[in-house]
Amino acid sequence: MEFSIKSGNPEKQRGACVVVGVFESRKLTPPAASIDKASNGHLSDLLRRGDMDGKAGSTLLLHNVPGTLCDRVLLVGLGKEKEYRDKQYCASVRNALKALNDTGAQNAIVFLTETPVAKRSVAWRIRQAAMLGRESAYRFEQFKSKKNETHPRLRKLAFTVEQKNELALAEDALRQGQAIGEGVALARTLGNLPGNVCTPTYLAETALQIAKEHAIACEVLERADMEKLGMHSLLSVAKGDRKSVV
């Protein structure tokens, strides 16, 4: 997955899909309102007809929205505005990513990161979105001879900020989120590997490789080191294994 940061009007974005939020009682977020204005009330008309009410967990995919340059517009329900906190924000981003993966769109511009979250900064919103984006892209297919590809995967995600002076801060937050996301993905992969592959030696070699790539220190403990440190519980678990503890 390729991530980037953007700033601009949603109706002027070229791409496969633009993602904007709607609160309960059909209240449009500023990016959604911008698209609504450009489309002469197209979104408002749909909401008044009952196509969507903004409840948390709901999504509505629209094609060829008048006044926009993108192929699709995805409306994401954010729930009650007064209750929009960390949990609701992360849930809305997850719902958006799931809906995007179901559409077959290969790129998207996500404006949910512009929606304020109580006591949270722009950097926090971007960081969380990047982590969730990496999470949605995770696949463990190392031992699959045939991959189940029903449609193209989402490959590029752009997260937006409202002000251009927020771009540098958002870029830093994006890098942090990507790094955390990659770490989580590695941990999941190591956990998914069978024991005869992910041996203590394999773990040690993986750690050493990461240390080499990022110029950080890494110390691998041998059996004698563990005995000296009193790590008897760990040693007793591995005692019957033909593989070395490290």
What residue ranges belong to the model's regions?
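Short amphipathic alpha-helical segment within the helicase RecA-like ATPase core
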Residues: 1-246
